[in-house]
A protein has these predicted regions:
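Glycine-aliphatic tripeptides that mark coil-to-beta-strand junctions in extracellular
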Residues: 1, 8-16
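A residue-level detector for conformationally permissive "hinge/kink" positions
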Residues: 3-4, 132
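Amphipathic alpha-helical interaction elements
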Residues: 5-6, 147
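Extracellular, cysteine-rich, disulfide-stabilized repeat modules with beta-strand cores
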Residues: 6-8, 26-27
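Residue-level hotspots within well-ordered secondary structure
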Residues: 18-172
Length: 172
């Protein structure tokens, strides 16, 4: 994309035209300790990087957005972060942080026996019932999502890591 429109996935299409975009992978040389994964977050103790995959839409009225974390260490706790700005990518623990600005922390979840977590549907309704307007998922707002998780045996020995990120341009 040219001009002032963001293009986080570098595909030449302005992100606001796509609604939902994945970004913040961990290509070389960005991994904090060489734990690079160009297709996901930085490598964790499973041997691969964790993914945060969107499904559904960016429509607040439909409220059908689902964000699924996968390739996560088994039976570990984590939280989804949403921020109104993109930062970095910044080295953070064994991974990269890309969700920043005004940050909201969603309810903690365990990765369970499958190494997965799911948030949604109903994210817009939850945000409206829980947070002040500045942190709500409203039409016309842009939010960046990542899942932060504990990973004590992780490759860099920092004890935690993050998935790649998803940016959502919320519409009516």
């Amino acid at each position: 994309a040219f001009g002032t429109s963001p293009d986080f996935d570098a595909n030449g299409i302005p992100d606001e035209c796509q609604g939902i975009v994945k970004y913040c992978t961990c290509p070389a040389p960005l991994g904090p300790c060489g734990n690079n994964d160009p297709n996901a977050g930085c490598i964790n103790s499973t041997g691969v990087g964790a993914l945060f995959t969107p499904s559904g839409s960016s429509s607040v009225a439909a409220d059908d957005l689902v964000l699924t974390g996968s390739q996560l260490p088994l039976n570990k706790i984590g939280v989804m972060l949403s921020g109104n700005m993109s930062v970095g990518p910044l080295p953070f623990g064994d991974g990269l942080r890309c969700a920043g600005g005004l940050v909201a922390r969603w309810p903690a979840k365990f990765t369970g026996a499958t190494g997965t977590v799911t948030y949604g549907p109903g994210l817009s309704a939850y945000s409206a019932a829980t947070w002040p307007p500045a942190k709500q998922l409203l039409p016309g707002t842009i939010w960046h999502f990542q899942f932060w998780f504990r990973d004590p045996p992780g490759p860099c020995s920092n004890g935690f890591n993050l998935t790649d990120a998803v940016v959502v341009f919320f519409g009516p």
